[in-house]
Amino acid sequence: MLRIAIAKGRLMDSLINYLDVIEYTTLSETLKNRERQLLLSVDNIECILVKGSDVPIYVEQGMADIGIVGSDILDERQYNVNNLLNMPFGACHFAVAAKPETTNYRKIATSYVHTAETYFKSKGIDVELIKLNGSVELACVVDMVDGIVDIVQTGTTLKANGLVEKQHISDINARLITNKAAYFKKSQLIEQFIRSLEVSIANA
């Protein structure tokens, strides 16, 4: 049995779409037909559905052998896991966004403090970072901050709130991570699962 931690929300939707494309029907249908279950079983796989930021923790602690998580989570802090493969779905990017007329930044709201701090330091810009846990666009709309650093996929949310993308920071994609011990103890099962996703180890 292989236990896989999967990030709920947008990334899981991207995973399901990808599974449909490669016709991995059993796993796709199991994820689609979940109700409120957080633990699902199919074939020789057990899926645990958790918040994105918790995926590497479950893997690190040995509660999951494999994790599928956005690279944004892995960029924010170090985890003792094997950061194994790029996955061909879940593409988006970090960006600085603000009102169209904004040209200078003193305060920035973000859920991704490390990414924002690294970016502005690299540009030699001294900003005050305010950490928020969601709806960072609102902080800019009500003028609490001059701009935000957030994940952008289509830009629809920015546009709906009267904001525009100012600078592209870095690309984000889904990553496959493994528990370090499980990578050796369950190498055959892990490699079999990777093959079933039609992903090559060359994508590391």
UniProtKB/Swiss-Prot annotation:
Assigned GO CC terms: cytoplasm
Record field: catalytic activity: 1-(5-phospho-beta-D-ribosyl)-ATP + diphosphate = 5-phospho-alpha-D-ribose 1-diphosphate + ATP
Compartments reported by the entry: Cytoplasm
GO BP: any one term: L-histidine biosynthetic process
Pathway: Amino-acid biosynthesis; L-histidine biosynthesis; L-histidine from 5-phospho-alpha-D-ribose 1-diphosphate: step 1/9
Signal peptide positions (record): none
Family annotation (InterPro entries): ATP_PRibTrfase_cat, ATP_PRibTrfase_HisG, ATP_PRibTrfase_HisG_short
GO MF terms, alphabetically ordered: ATP binding; ATP phosphoribosyltransferase activity
Enzyme kind, highest EC tier: transferase
The keyword Transferase is annotated on this UniProt entry: yes
Record NCBIfam families: hisG
Assembly and oligomerization: Heteromultimer composed of HisG and HisZ subunits.
Family: Belongs to the ATP phosphoribosyltransferase family. Short subfamily.
Entry remark concerning the domains of this protein: Lacks the C-terminal regulatory region which is replaced by HisZ.
Functional summary from the UniProt entry: Catalyzes the condensation of ATP and 5-phosphoribose 1-diphosphate to form N'-(5'-phosphoribosyl)-ATP (PR-ATP). Has a crucial role in the pathway because the rate of histidine biosynthesis seems to be controlled primarily by regulation of HisG enzymatic activity.
The protein's name in its UniProt record: ATP phosphoribosyltransferase
